[in-house]
Amino acid sequence: METHSELWSLEAIKEVYNTPIFELIHRANAILRSNFPHSELQTCYLVSIKTGGCTEDCAYCAQSSRYQTHVKPEPMMKITEVLDRAKQAIRAGATRVCLGAAWREVKDNHQFDRTLEMIKGITDMGAEVCCTLGMLTPSQAEKLFEAGLYAYNHNLDSSEGFYKTIITTRKYEDRLRTLDIVEKSGLHVCCGGIIGMGETVEDRVELLHNLARRERMPESVPVNVLWPIKGTPLYDQASISFWEILRTIATARIVFPQSMVRLAAGRAFLSVEQQTLCFIAGANSIFYGEKLLTVDNNDMDADTAMLNLLGMRHRPSFSMERGQPCQSVTC
């Protein structure tokens, strides 16, 4: 039997991406329905526990200290503040809480200790917790696991070739090494990328191929659409079409049949009808709440109304145990 990496060559993924749109959506929807309960949507709430002041030069990011944007460095949030926001989000229907910090890497200090306490507190509320904190060591990953962390987010962003044009302060190999550490710790991997940065279709295909070559499939694959922010190098980047977004979502669903495919940043650009097409084509996770780190997101009440309109229900927390790898299947 072919392994997942053998099955999904660059050529095979590109062929899927370029499939006629009706056939592509039909295939992706069939795979979604065969692997997940019908009409179930994961709702994630994102909290920026440390905003701004990042030393990296990611061309898309408002939190870089190298650019003059609307974002100013803020002190790290207090534990009680984060727990209060998490509690409100869970009451509103969120089943995963994601904690983000504008760090290049995790440091063994009081801020990391505070993050561990946040994880413990939110886990005790019955929600999954995901963190995106930058690069980390094996011992730090172990501490996160012991604190109850469910998943760790570390995106590849794009293909290795295109990556070099948007980030110079961190190598692609550094990101792959971080994913290795997360996988070995027993934590679930949340890893995807950003589209609409000026990359080609080949770059998007290579991003998915790099993920498909991993020993374990990611638990979540977030698909972010660039939100151009004034002051960043990509502010004047032309928008991509909705059909490119839809093709990326559907291709990700086909390549990663048992992973959550998250319609992440940029969703606020899409109408309810466009979002519905993305759900039909394989997206089964969204960020729930008015803010995604530094950019706007859909209003929570509007999202609740959309879910009710579509007859969708919230995916329960801990539908997959920690340490349980996502098994690839041939589709």
UniProtKB/Swiss-Prot annotation:
Family recorded in the similarity comment: Belongs to the radical SAM superfamily. Biotin synthase family.
Protein name per UniProt: Biotin synthase
Alphabetized HAMAP family for the sequence: BioB
Alphabetical list of InterPro entries matching this protein: Aldolase_TIM (IPR013785), BATS_dom (IPR010722), Biotin_synth/BioAB (IPR002684), Biotin_synthase (IPR024177), Elp3/MiaA/NifB-like_rSAM (IPR006638), rSAM (IPR007197)
Oligomer and partners: Homodimer.
Pfam families linked: BATS, Radical_SAM
PANTHER family per UniProt: BIOTIN SYNTHASE, BIOTIN SYNTHASE, MITOCHONDRIAL
Role summary: Catalyzes the conversion of dethiobiotin (DTB) to biotin by the insertion of a sulfur atom into dethiobiotin via a radical-based mechanism.
Pathway connected to this protein: Cofactor biosynthesis; biotin biosynthesis; biotin from 7,8-diaminononanoate: step 2/2
BP terms from Gene Ontology: biotin biosynthetic process
Cofactor(s) named in the record: [4Fe-4S] cluster; [2Fe-2S] cluster
Enzyme Commission number(s) from the entry: 2.8.1.6
Record keywords, A-Z: 2Fe-2S, 4Fe-4S, Biotin biosynthesis, Iron, Iron-sulfur, Metal-binding, S-adenosyl-L-methionine, Transferase
Lineage: Bacteria, Pseudomonadati, Chlamydiota, Chlamydiia, Chlamydiales
Residue span(s) of domain Radical SAM core: 39-264
Gene symbol of the encoding locus: bioB
